[in-house]
């Protein structure tokens, strides 16, 4: 503090300075974080007191055969947890209020987030719990899902015709129980990718990408959760990404109800890259995008010469043979795909 005192003139003999320091305390309250930067401008008048600690689950994503109790917790005191089971994103006003352990007895895609007034909420955590005994006999359209896709009959169910089911399971002599057991084993034989999103992102008549498969570009990209589950049924990886329909003639639902899709990993959703060795130890362990091909030219939708004529492996075999001969070739693998808990 500096005091500057002046007398009347340089010849004046009287000079007195009697400063008084008066201070006022302004209670600014608790420190706050600003979620929106305002360089060169006043701070955002809002701000947050802190961040809600991430949600924790007592049971991780994966395969299950028996019912279990699922507990969800956050270390932040007096925080509220909300969850959904229909693929939608929980908010402070949307979703079930978590009050205690939840009984999980069937295939469930559960999304949860924690909230507290004045705090930044958690991100949305997604957990897919897949009961393969039920998946193996998956029924028709779930409640709220359309019975037709852009004028084409929707196809959600497993083909449970005993003869076809046995042959698809690997042996025409299988009993229904044996075919079901073999199907369950097959569902555990290769990696699983579970995609979870708002139902309307897929099936809204005007904006859903599955009902408007000709839509291209970022305007037809929808946010999704992506989970990778290993053959042993243990969850390996989860991130959020963008999802688009891809292909040319394969976009036609009259040709195939099983559309090709593409996952795009971007920072605006979650991880900027998929950081997981999806194609095995010899393949890359980082991906900007992944194509999920339905392989319509060599699958059940194009078995024009009869049931069982498709090989399913022709395209991938050709790529691997090309690569093994020292030539450039795209890498690929096989995986089971689920959309909002439904086997696809």
Where does each model-flagged region fall?
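A compositionally biased, intrinsically disordered/low-complexity signal enriched
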Residues: 3, 102-104, 290
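Short beta-strand-plus-loop segments that form exposed binding edges in beta-rich domains
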Residues: 3-11
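Short glycine-centered, acidic/aromatic-flanked micro-motifs in structured strand/loop junctions
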Residues: 5, 85, 294
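Extracytoplasmic/secreted cell-surface and envelope-processing proteins
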Residues: 11-13, 301
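Short, compositionally stereotyped local motifs that mark structural "simplifiers"
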Residues: 14-223, 228-239
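Conserved ATP-binding subdomain of kinase catalytic cores across diverse folds
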Residues: 195, 201-202, 208-344
């Amino acid at each position: 503090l500096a005091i500057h005192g002046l007398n009347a003139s340089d010849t004046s003999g009287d000079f007195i300075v009697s400063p008084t320091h008066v201070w006022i305390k302004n209670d600014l309250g608790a420190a706050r974080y600003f979620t929106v930067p305002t360089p060169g401008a006043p701070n955002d008048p809002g701000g947050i007191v802190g961040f809600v600690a991430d949600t924790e689950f007592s049971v991780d994503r994966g395969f299950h055969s028996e019912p279990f109790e699922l507990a969800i917790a956050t270390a932040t005191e007096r925080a509220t947890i909300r969850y959904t089971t229909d693929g939608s994103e929980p908010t402070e006003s949307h979703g079930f209020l978590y009050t205690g352990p939840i009984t999980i007895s069937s295939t469930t895609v559960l999304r949860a987030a924690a909230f507290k007034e004045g705090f930044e909420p958690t991100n949305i955590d997604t957990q897919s719990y897949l009961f393969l005994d039920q998946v193996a006999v998956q029924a028709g359209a779930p409640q709220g899902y359309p019975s037709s896709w852009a004028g084409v009959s929707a196809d959600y169910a497993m083909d449970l015709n005993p003869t076809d089911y046995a042959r698809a399971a690997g042996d025409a002599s299988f009993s229904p129980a044996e075919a079901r057991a073999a199907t369950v084993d097959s569902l555990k034989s290769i990696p699983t990718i579970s995609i979870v999103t708002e139902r309307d992102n897929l099936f809204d008549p005007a904006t859903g990408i599955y009902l408007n498969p000709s839509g291209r570009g970022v305007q037809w990209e929808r946010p999704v959760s992506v989970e990778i589950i290993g053959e042993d049924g243990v969850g390996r990886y989860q991130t959020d990404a963008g999802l688009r329909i891809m292909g040319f003639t394969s976009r036609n639902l009259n040709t195939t109800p099983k559309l090709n899709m593409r996952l795009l990993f971007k920072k605006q959703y979650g991880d900027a890259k998929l950081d997981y060795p999806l194609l095995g130890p010899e393949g890359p362990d980082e991906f900007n995008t992944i194509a999920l091909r339905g392989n319509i030219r060599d699958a059940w939708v194009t078995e024009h010469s009869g049931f069982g004529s498709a090989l399913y492996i022709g395209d991938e075999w050709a790529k691997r043979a090309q690569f093994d001969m020292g030539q450039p070739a795209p890498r690929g693998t096989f995986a089971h795909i689920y959309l909002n808990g439904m086997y696809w």
